């Protein structure tokens, strides 16, 4: 087997077509497959249960994540929900208090249905974590870097604590992908992805994946995926595998640009704070440098102006597209409070530190100079520092 990820993803599915010798894998759209004889099932019988395109995608993702197998699902959220089937009803799940809004919504909804018990915990708060682990959780959910505040936790250290109370560990690796982080090598039990993001990388697929560290868990995932019908479509799997082939090349460029933009934003007078693990000022920079292979292409920042000026900034911004999602070739900007995290209760957003002035950036493949020029022009429309100071004084009276 190839030793390098670049070779793995470039050769995945190549020469798989033994019938016609197609170099690139065909799209297998058939909903069902014939039996070779009575009682003799082939490798596939029904598309919900198995499909060659999904198999190829899961195989290469398992290799990249150093796992034992898993499932390609219809979305990132269905991947998250699939994992919950592997724990007993009513079991406790510990999740980060600053997780993606869709994850927060899912766990909150499942808790209301009494399917799970949920504890949203600041995973940097040692006392809060110790109290949560004392309750013997069945599952520890990690999102690192977190969405949208780019907080980083020590996966290996948290896994050790979780294993001490017999808890399984899931890591959402969407923000970095296996190109930059391999949680299973740090002893996590599961990795989840929204394959919509960096893995596909072209903003034309919605999908998800769960990869397990051990074969028994992988088989359980497959059984539940077939049972609940959350498996992804063949064409989506084919598109994702096609996009995956350029993953390392894309991330290398995107990450380089993100680092430049983060440094410049951090020095700009119209920006109050920048969240990017690659900055030496980031509180978890050392942890990120230890467990990641790079700092990624996602960042967020707060404007140094009142929340109502976010609208002015967005109106003046070009090159970037105002949209949810991330990880595509195009640069995106989002306002978490009204977009990606709008489903979170306002008090939950406040607890997580998601301010109304916060903007999240997914850096694409455009030239970094064009991206910075666009940001600079938009930042220039914000009130000047003296005006901001005067308004703060006026507000304090």
Task: Name these PLM-found stretches.
Residues 1-6, 14, 52, 273, ...:
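Positively charged, small/polar-rich N-terminal and surface patches that mediate targeting and assembly
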Residues 1-27, 210:
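Short conserved active-site loop signatures built around small residues
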Residues 32-86, 102-109:
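Conserved N-terminal alpha-helix of the aminotransferase class I/II PLP-enzyme fold
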Residues 117-119, 135, 315, 331-397:
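PLP-dependent enzyme catalytic core of the Aspartate aminotransferase-like
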Residues 240-249, 296-304, 360-364:
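Short, well-ordered beta-strand elements within core beta-sheets of diverse protein domains
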């Amino acid at each position: 087997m190839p030793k390098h990820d670049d070779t793995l993803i470039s050769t995945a599915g190549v020469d798989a077509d033994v019938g016609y010798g197609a170099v690139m894998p065909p799209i297998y759209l058939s909903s069902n497959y014939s039996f070779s004889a009575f009682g003799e099932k082939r490798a596939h019988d029904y598309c919900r249960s198995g499909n060659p395109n999904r198999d190829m995608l899961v195989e290469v993702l398992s290799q990249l994540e150093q796992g034992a197998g898993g499932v390609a699902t219809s979305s990132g959220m269905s991947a998250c929900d699939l994992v919950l089937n592997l724990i007993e009803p009513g079991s406790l799940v510990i999740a980060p208090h600053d997780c993606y809004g869709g994850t927060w919504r899912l766990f909150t909804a499942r808790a209301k249905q009494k399917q799970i018990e949920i504890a949203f915990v600041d995973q940097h708060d040692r006392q809060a974590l110790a109290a949560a682990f004392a309750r013997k959780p069945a599952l520890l959910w990690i999102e690192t870097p977190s969405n949208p505040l780019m907080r980083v936790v020590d996966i290996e250290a948290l896994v050790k604590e979780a294993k001490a109370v017999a808890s399984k560990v899931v890591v959402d690796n969407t923000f970095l992908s296996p190109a930059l982080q391999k949680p299973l090598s740090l002893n996590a039990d599961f990795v989840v992805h929204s394959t919509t993001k960096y893995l596909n990388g072209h903003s034309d697929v919605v999908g998800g994946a769960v990869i397990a560290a051990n074969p028994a868990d992988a088989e359980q995932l497959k059984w539940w995926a077939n049972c609940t019908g959350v498996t992804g479509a063949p064409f989506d799997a084919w598109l994702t595998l096609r996009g995956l082939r350029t993953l390392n090349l894309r991330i290398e460029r995107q990450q380089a640009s993100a680092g430049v933009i983060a440094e410049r934003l951090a020095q700009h007078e119209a920006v109050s704070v920048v969240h990017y693990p690659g900055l030496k000022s980031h509180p978890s920079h050392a942890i990120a440098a230890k467990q990641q292979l790079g700092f990624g292409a996602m960042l967020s920042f707060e404007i140094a102006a009142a929340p109502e000026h976010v609208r002015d900034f967005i109106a003046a911004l070009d090159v970037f597209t105002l949209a949810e999602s991330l990880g595509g070739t195009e640069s995106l900007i989002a306002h978490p409070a009204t977009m990606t995290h709008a489903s979170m209760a306002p008090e939950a957003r406040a607890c997580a530190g998601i301010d109304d002035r916060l903007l999240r950036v997914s850096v694409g493949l455009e030239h970094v100079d064009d991206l910075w020029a666009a940001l600079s022009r938009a930042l220039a429309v914000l009130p000047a520092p003296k005006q901001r100071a005067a308004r703060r004084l006026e507000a304090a009276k």
